[in-house]
């Protein structure tokens, strides 16, 4: 959807100015695309380990109750005529972006399933746990020219946890978000309401409230190079008519974008927006992005499907385009950098990785507040020597 300012907001936390810094030499990691143009690294086909839902009050449920079903308009009928402004602001309940959720919902799922993880309990000790949105930012970093980021990292029982921190600049932009941008964010969610049904075979109901607290999240296992990954990401809907109903290949990502009317506009779209769409969908193995193109009045009159594995073809011959190998190689390099930097096993010790466009990734070290992000309830529960439930069969 376009833009997703709040959607991944669940994965951020706001902090004050750095304090409690611990003296330590600060290594760095360059981000120049030319340094990462080697062959595409190994990336294990993502497999879904489970899922969870967040309800209208943002409460966690370890099930698929919030999953919606892809229900596009008939291809043989009149084209769509979706009014993306309908219901704004009267039927809009946006999530409170001041609430610092960090990794908490994913950690709830981990606590529920720690004894039944594919690969056994030893696998988690070697893994990196994070949100899909954080990995997406890493993938796009070599080509990003505007927005920096900060990632807090802590090691606990061997596992490396990564949680995004809202930068001061990002916070300032969010608090000063102009009305037009707030409306554009609503329009992206409204598009989902036009394209999704609550039950298989039923029709969408765009007359209801748009509540961005509600979310369905997939939890996935993968591996990039030598780095086992356990990450979660929000899923827009599942396609009951997909060739395979096995997650994540049945999932569909929904986006909106303004109509394009010139080759230059399309070229810019392929270079910038399509890169982010590719990174967001490639990581969890979502095969298709369905885009609704809106006119200046906020109506969607055309849809286009972008297969994730074919997105690179739009920029393959563009010297100013992006390269998937560069994205994945940089991400792998960052994960190696983080693994070798965060050595001490201490949930209250935080290495803060910071990056601004044009520079390298730098590191600072902090103890406890404001950067520590692993909650006490999670640390205590994982520390207790409780018997593990029986394993469930490993998903293929």
From Swiss-Prot:
Localisation per UniProt entry: Nucleus
Residues at which Mg(2+) 2 binds: 192, 234, 236
Entry note: cofactor: Binds 2 magnesium ions.
Region spans: Disordered: 1-37
Cofactors: Mg(2+)
Documented EC number(s): 3.6.1.-, 3.1.13.-
Composition bias, Basic and acidic residues: 1-20
Pfam families reported for this sequence: RAI1
Modified residue annotations for Phosphoserine: 394
Molecular function in Gene Ontology: 5'-3' exonuclease activity; magnesium ion binding; mRNA 5'-diphosphatase activity; mRNA binding; nucleotide binding; RNA NAD+-cap (NAD+-forming) hydrolase activity
Binding-site positions, Mg(2+) 1: 192, 236, 253-254
Main location: nucleus
Biological process terms in GO annotation: mRNA catabolic process; NAD-cap decapping; nuclear mRNA surveillance; nuclear-transcribed mRNA catabolic process; nucleic acid metabolic process; RNA destabilization
Role description: Decapping enzyme for NAD-capped RNAs: specifically hydrolyzes the nicotinamide adenine dinucleotide (NAD) cap from a subset of RNAs by removing the entire NAD moiety from the 5'-end of an NAD-capped RNA. The NAD-cap is present at the 5'-end of some RNAs and snoRNAs. In contrast to the canonical 5'-end N7 methylguanosine (m7G) cap, the NAD cap promotes mRNA decay. Preferentially acts on NAD-capped transcripts in response to environmental stress.
Family: Belongs to the DXO/Dom3Z family.
UniProt protein name: Decapping and exoribonuclease protein
UniProt organism field: Homo sapiens (Human)
